């Protein structure tokens, strides 16, 4: 478990609403892509229903915003391309280095 400083925690809580809205915007664009497919309306409906339910589940898991889960939430936003490591430049060097290390380790696992 990581304990980041109070400044990082306050900055995270400040940026969180913007990041969440960016994530919702990304999801809405993806939903529009599903609706715009050249398939049967019922197929689009059920595909969208399945996708929304899956996204709701992930959002509920991420809804556990606490200082002890801050790194997990940040990595989730990075993994889903809501933010990048550059969005963390205002955070402490410790947090930035920690996130960079996690991204490097997990990209090795997922990429190869």
Q: Language-model segments: which ranges?
A:
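Acidic, Ser/Pro/Thr-rich low-complexity regulatory regions
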Residues: 1-112
